[in-house]
Amino acid sequence: MSVAVRTAFVLCAGWGKRLQPLTNQIPKPMVPICGIPLCQFALARIAAADVERIVINTHRLADEFIRLFPEYPQPSHFRGIPVLFRHEPVLLETAGGLKNIEDLLLPGPVLVHNGDILAALDLPALFAAHAKSGALCTLALRSSGGPLQVGFDRPTGLVTDIRGEIGSSAPRFLYTGVCVVDPALLPRIPPGEPLSFVPVWLDALRAGEKIAGVVLDDGIWRDIGNVEEYLRIHADLASGAVEIASPVEKSEWPRWRMPGARVDSSAKLNGWNWLGPDCQVSAGATVENSILWAGSKVEPGANVASSVVREGMLAAGEVHDTVV
């Protein structure tokens, strides 16, 4: 099996239903974290891992990727690395999405990385584990932080079960949404069908094939799965409870007040707040622990707390623990 991981596939085609109504305007991978699209954090880690090509799949609200890639849907670049796009008129899920870009893959294993997680995983360690394993796929795992559904035997480095389907008694770990797939797995995926990786992995395990894993507990890993978690990651960044390197080269990040944000002298800002470009906080308004997307407006006298005001929206009156 080939060693070098030359292609990265970033999964950006999901609906983001749990994050609605934020994802009514933009796809989940483009939801901003302190102004930076969520998928850009994955792209920055991938670029630092020296891959040679990045492929991104899209589905709903695909034109919003123009915000990050002005050339979309034409080929683009990220930090000098060629970026190709493949639109899915019908959502193909994870394994189906990978099969759908088979013609775009460079020879060798491919890194598959969810585009809607905030993570700083040690990708070179994942690559090394895969090269050593001789497995069809190597999963990046964590000991905690979400559903523990992958049975994993650490002494052998092999996955023994997924979602309890096989009945293994091995300790359970979290699958991070990041893995390395060997080309030998691709023939097991039928073309043109919506299919997740889980049944593909289970079929391989039942056939006696090796699926490997590596536990990567260092660095941040967050699934921004709902509005509460979206607010929480901003609160943690503001307090310093969480640190993550800037995904923008030669740029200070996070920035809490973006260019063009306007705050009336009689308005009050309490706690942490992220103020997007050209947003407006009007006279007598109070904003606390909230996120104002670009072009949003808090009306005079409004009281906004623990809320998100989406792009171009108006917040008036009492706005608490909600999305406008």
What are these regions (language model features)?
Residues 1-10, 32-114, 125, 310, ...:
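Conserved N-terminal catalytic core of the sugar/cofactor nucleotidyltransferase
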Residues 11-19:
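Conserved adenylation A10 loop of the ANL superfamily
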Residues 15, 115-117:
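Active-site metal-binding loops of divalent metal-dependent hydrolases
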Residues 110-111, 118, 123-131, 142-145, ...:
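Catalytic-core segments of class I nucleotidyltransferases/pyrophosphorylases
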Residues 137-152:
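Short beta-strand-to-loop element that shapes/binds the nucleotide-sugar donor at the catalytic cleft/hinge
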Residues 152-158:
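Short acidic-glycine loop/turn motifs at beta-strand connectors
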Residues 206-286:
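Extended, small-residue-rich solenoid/repeat segments and analogous flexible loops
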Residues 283-324:
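Glycine-rich hexapeptide-repeat left-handed beta-helix
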